[in-house]
Structure formats: structure tokens, C-alpha cells
Amino acid sequence: MIHTLAINKHNEIRTNLPIEEILEGDFQWSWNDFDQPIDDEIEKLHHPFRFHPLSIEDCLHNLQRPKIDYFETYTFFVTHCLNPKTIKKDELNIFLGKNFIVTFHHHASIEVNAVKEMLTREDVATWTQYTVLYQLLDHLVDNYFPIVYDIEDSLAEIDENPTKKTMEALLDELFSTRHQLLSLRHTVVPMKDIVHQMINSEKIAALLTKKEYYSDIYDHLLKISELVESNRELTTDIRDSYLSYNSHHSNRIMQILTVITTIFMPLSFLAGLYGMNFVNMPELQWKYGYFLLLFIMASIGIGMFILFKRKGWFK
């Protein structure tokens, strides 16, 4: 579906006009939103807009790397949106021209809907297509923050483990969180490069007077990027701590088993020695031989147990 919004000379909003009528009419600027378009609607990118085939191809191939392409009559942006609840990545393509902005997305966009709502309730005279671009990027980046904060909370819970989950369950959660951070990093870093390029480029003349606004977005992206990196390091630290604890726990178990085996070695030797079928073994003929052997074996076992306990091998 294509949603159109055009601002006439009297700063009045006209909605859902045909694109051809908007482009041929006397409007200050327009916003044309391609919301999950069908094939016939996609054709309008070719005509009447006449966008470059490479830009249209990028729109149709979802989840391209975020970037900016400069053309003679427009600038093309590929940006990534993240759903704060599901962390699902989606692509928002933006065409920015002299008197128009076109947005293209394959799924419903909460950023686009939020900016549309802002535009309809604020003073339209203060808005241009460049304002729409800024608001889209600002909303898009702001939606990254809840994701980072949720991940931080998850890491804190994994670290404290209040529900006493098993080591295997904790490591599964930790690796899942690390994967989320990696996905977030693959989104934030290219977006940061895009905004930095916008701030330092002179190819979009109208943005030169709005650098402080885009610098604010860039600062937000820097903060998010730093949070992502610090949380990735934290996942590594937590993982190493768990693995170290698990290794230490395994070593303690092996130590106890080794001590038990060591205690039983002389006992097994005595049992094996007197279990041999030799006729000439005088001790076997003595009526107290059996009890003496039991006493010796018990003394050896108790003595070795006391020795190892004093050395702290059973702690």
C-alpha cells in the first residue's frame, strides 16, 4: 500500500493523492510511504519517480548493509530498524529529493507510524522532507536503547543467578545474549558510519544547517556502540568465570575421587595378597588372622583419611 502526504502552499496537508498528481501539482513537498507494496506499486519507483535501478534493486533485496548512495536528483539511504521487543531486524529505505521523501519497507514500521503521528499533530509549517528524515533516524536510533538496556538486565540476572539455574542453562542464555549483541553491533556500526558521513558531507546542502541535530543522533549511536562493546566484554568475563568455576569444581571432584582411590589402594593390595590360593600362608591358619587383617586395613584407611583431611583435601 502507498500512503501519500503532500503539503500545499498554504501549509495544508493533503493525504492519499495519486503520486502523479502530487509530482505534477503545486506542492511544497511530499512524503510517499511504500508500506509493504505489491508489484504494481513497486513499479511507481520506476515511473513516475524514475529512481535508479540499483536503488530499486536494493529495496527489493531486504536487509542490505546500511549505506548512503548519492544520485543526481536524490539521495538514497538504506537503514536498519530493530523491534525493541523481538530484536527482529528490518530494513527501511529512504529516497530524499529536492521536494519529496519516499520511504519503502517490507513490514509495518513503528518508526514511520510514529513520525506520521508527530507530523499530523504539530505545526506543518515547521516541517520539510528533511525534518521527516531527521525524525525517522532519531526514532530509529532511540529504539535501539531499550534493546541494549534489556540485554544489560539479562546479563545482570545471568551473573547473579537468583533462580539457581544449572550451569548448562546459564551458558545457553549467555551465548544467546552474546548473539543478540553481535546482531545489534552489525546494525549499530554501519548506522553510525552513515550519520557520520551525513555530518561531514556537503552533498546534501540542506543538512549543512542541521548538523547539530545529526550530531546528537551520532552521539546516541556512539553511546549505544560503547554499551554493546562493554556488554560483549561482560559476556566474555561471565563466560570465563563460569568455565573457571566449572573447571575448579571438576578438579575438586577429581581430587576427592583420587583421595578415595588412594585410600583403597593399600586395602586392595592386602585383600589381593591374602586372597591368593597358596597352601603355605601361616597367617591364614591363625585363628585371629582374619580379625588382625581387618584391624590393619581399618587402621590404614582411617589413618590415611585423617592425614588427607588435615591437609585439606576434603574441603
Identify the residue ranges that each predicted region occupies.
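Peripheral, non-transmembrane regulatory/ligand-interaction domains of membrane transport proteins
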Residues: 1-207, 213-216, 220-223, 227, ...
